[in-house]
């Protein structure tokens, strides 16, 4: 399909064009072919035309760290710090999950993400073959990561490699994968060494939690006399490209390790606040030119998958933490939620900008809303004024997924019904 979005404000996230006050975007198949100021003067025959008047186009948002299947546990285990929350609530009930549960939960997550402009998500969970199915059925870009933890790590690593082989054969263009060891405190040294070697051998990126809480840092320090970053460096995890979630408790040397290895940091401000884990020193990492992107974490610790909320929280929290209103601008937050996320997760595809030859993942926001007027600074409006309900068009991989707030190929009512029935099965048994 070829799509023309005309009469639209365009936030390109590209330094050369930045914001186009009124222009057009031409999409052919899965790529952006033209982005220009003014009117499209070419032949409009056979084009699917979207009138963008009163709307703003942004690159599709990239949720760089989540656990989509955990929508089941939204609001479950409230009011506990991370370690108690995991040990007393989450891990025991997760043992009851089956593949079909994760599929239905991920369907709900996909709806929630698409509705608020997220077109790509980086997942770490169980039964990831079900997540593959959902990504393809719902036409959302998915980075698939089998969660590797505990004594079953060898089986889980094999599962990750097997899924990666299938993804490489997939023709949808929507899928990639990462090797996803859960964390340094849920895996042995031997396991992490083996995972590091396998990731390097397979040329796969790694997705891992690092230094989320002070408890984690203390556990690793007591066991290995190293910080989590120092320990992971010693076992070879950083020999591959790494996307590190949280990174709340880092020493100066830890930040140097991340910088030297080209590691991307995934900032999860709402989850870190809700679990009282702490505040990551994001502004300092940005000053060091560490690539910082943004994630929601799972709904059980957030409790939503709204990247627009995450941008606002993320920037306000840094301003407050440093007591400096100049820290982490709205434009930088949007970059973290788009291009920086794509840069962290995807190696050989152009994603995260509205620019010629980039993948056509685009969201349109309706600016004709009380909370979106006036438009003195469009980046500020998107980050501080929007709440996600303004998203009324979503395009993923060159296909229109949502039009005027309605899903084109997804039976939303069926998804909601199936999810509610599945929750009865989980919580009543």
Swiss-Prot record:
It holds the Pfam family Amidohydro_1. This is 5-methylthioadenosine/S-adenosylhomocysteine deaminase. It comes from Clostridium tetani (strain Massachusetts / E88). Belongs to the metallo-dependent hydrolases superfamily. MTA/SAH deaminase family. It comes from the Bacteria. Its cofactor is Zn(2+). The keyword tRNA-binding does not apply. It catalyses: S-adenosyl-L-homocysteine + H2O + H(+) = S-inosyl-L-homocysteine + NH4(+); S-methyl-5'-thioadenosine + H2O + H(+) = S-methyl-5'-thioinosine + NH4(+). Transmembrane segments: none annotated. Its EC number is 3.5.4.28, 3.5.4.31. Catalyzes the deamination of 5-methylthioadenosine and S-adenosyl-L-homocysteine into 5-methylthioinosine and S-inosyl-L-homocysteine, respectively. Is also able to deaminate adenosine. CDD domains: ATZ_TRZ_like (cd01298). GO terms for molecular function: 5'-methylthioadenosine deaminase activity; metal ion binding; S-adenosylhomocysteine deaminase activity. Disulfide bonds: none annotated. Zn(2+) binds at residues 65, 67, 209, 297. Keywords: Hydrolase, Metal-binding, Zinc. Binds 1 zinc ion per subunit. Substrate binds at residues 94, 182, 212, 297.
């Amino acid at each position: 399909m070829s799509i023309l979005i005309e009469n639209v404000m365009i936030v390109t996230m590209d330094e050369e064009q930045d914001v186009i006050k009124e222009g057009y975007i031409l999409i052919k198949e899965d790529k952006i072919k033209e982005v220009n100021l003014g009117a499209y003067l070419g032949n409009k025959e056979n084009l699917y035309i979207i009138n963008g008047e009163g709307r703003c186009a942004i690159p599709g948002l990239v949720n760089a760290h989540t656990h989509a299947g955990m929508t089941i546990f939204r609001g479950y285990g409230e009011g506990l710090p991370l370690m108690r929350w995991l040990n007393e609530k989450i891990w025991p009930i997760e043992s009851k999950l089956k593949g079909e549960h994760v599929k239905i939960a991920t369907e709900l997550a996909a709806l929630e993400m698409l509705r608020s402009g997220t077109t790509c998500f980086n997942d770490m969970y169980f039964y990831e073959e079900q997540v593959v199915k959902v990504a393809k059925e719902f036409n959302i870009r998915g980075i698939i990561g089998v969660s590797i933890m505990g004594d079953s790590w060898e089986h889980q690593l094999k599962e990750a490699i097997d899924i990666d082989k299938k993804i490489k054969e997939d023709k949808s263009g929507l899928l990639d994968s990462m090797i996803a060891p859960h964390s340094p405190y849920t895996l042995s040294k031997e396991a992490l060494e083996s995972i590091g070697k396998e990731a390097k051998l397979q040329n796969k990126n790694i997705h891992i939690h690092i230094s989320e809480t002070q408890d984690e840092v203390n556990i690793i320090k007591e066991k290995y006399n190293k910080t989590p970053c120092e320990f992971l460096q010693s076992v070879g995890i950083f020999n591959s490209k790494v996307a590190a979630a949280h990174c709340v408790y880092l020493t100066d040397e830890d930040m140097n390790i991340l910088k030297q290895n080209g590691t991307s940091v995934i900032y999860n401000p709402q989850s870190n606040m809700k679990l009282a884990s702490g505040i990551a020193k994001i502004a300092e990492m940005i000053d060091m030119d560490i690539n910082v992107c943004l994630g929601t974490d799972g709904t059980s610790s957030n409790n939503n998958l709204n990247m627009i909320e995450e941008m606002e929280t993320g920037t306000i929290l840094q301003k407050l933490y440093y007591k400096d209103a100049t820290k982490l601008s709205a434009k930088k937050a949007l970059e973290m939620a788009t291009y920086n996320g794509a840069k962290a997760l995807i190696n050989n595809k152009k994603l995260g900008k509205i620019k010629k030859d980039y993948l056509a993942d685009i969201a349109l926001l309706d600016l004709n809303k009380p909370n979106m007027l006036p438009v003195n600074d469009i980046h500020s409006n998107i980050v501080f004024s929007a709440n996600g309900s303004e998203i009324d068009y979503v395009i993923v991989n060159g296909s229109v997924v949502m039009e005027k707030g309605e899903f084109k190929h997804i039976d939303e009512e069926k998804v909601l019904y199936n999810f509610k029935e599945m929750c009865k099965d989980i919580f009543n048994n």
